[in-house]
Amino acid sequence: MTRKALMEKAKKEPKYSTRKVNRCKRCGRARGYMRKFDLCRICFRELAHKGEIPGVKKASW
């Protein structure tokens, strides 16, 4: 889990807009972030397998 200090720091508006860090809305992870869903890859995968993200299904070919 993400340290609380980093979560609070990410919520605060940065001095410059390029410093903004995208974080997962569910767990607060900064790496592997998917903008379209506001989730990290791990949370996205869990929710997709449960069928909780509309329009997303496992690829098969």
Swiss-Prot record:
Q: Which InterPro entries match?
A: Ribosomal_uS14, Ribosomal_uS14_bact, Ribosomal_uS14_CS, Ribosomal_uS14_sf
Q: Name one Pfam family in it.
A: Ribosomal_S14
**Which residues are listed for Zn(2+) binding in this entry?**
24, 27, 40, 43
Which Gene Ontology BP annotations are present?
translation
What keyword terms does UniProt attach to this protein?
A: Metal-binding, Ribonucleoprotein, Ribosomal protein, RNA-binding, rRNA-binding, Zinc
Mention any one GO cellular component term assigned to this protein in its UniProt record. small ribosomal subunit
Signal peptide (from-to): none
Q: Does the keyword RNA-binding apply?
A: yes
Identify which cofactors the protein needs according to its UniProt entry. Answer: Zn(2+)
Q: Does the keyword tRNA processing apply?
A: no
Q: Which GO terms describe its molecular function?
A: rRNA binding; structural constituent of ribosome; zinc ion binding
Q: Which domain of life is it from?
A: Bacteria
Copy out the cofactor comment.
Binds 1 zinc ion per subunit.
Q: What is said about its interaction partners and assembly?
A: Part of the 30S ribosomal subunit. Contacts proteins S3 and S10.
What family does the entry list?
Belongs to the universal ribosomal protein uS14 family. Zinc-binding uS14 subfamily.
The job of this chain, per UniProt, is described as: Binds 16S rRNA, required for the assembly of 30S particles and may also be responsible for determining the conformation of the 16S rRNA at the A site.
Please give the PANTHER family that the UniProt record associates with this protein.
30S RIBOSOMAL PROTEIN S14 (PTHR19836), SMALL RIBOSOMAL SUBUNIT PROTEIN US14M (PTHR19836:SF19)
Q: What is the protein name given in its UniProt record?
A: Small ribosomal subunit protein uS14
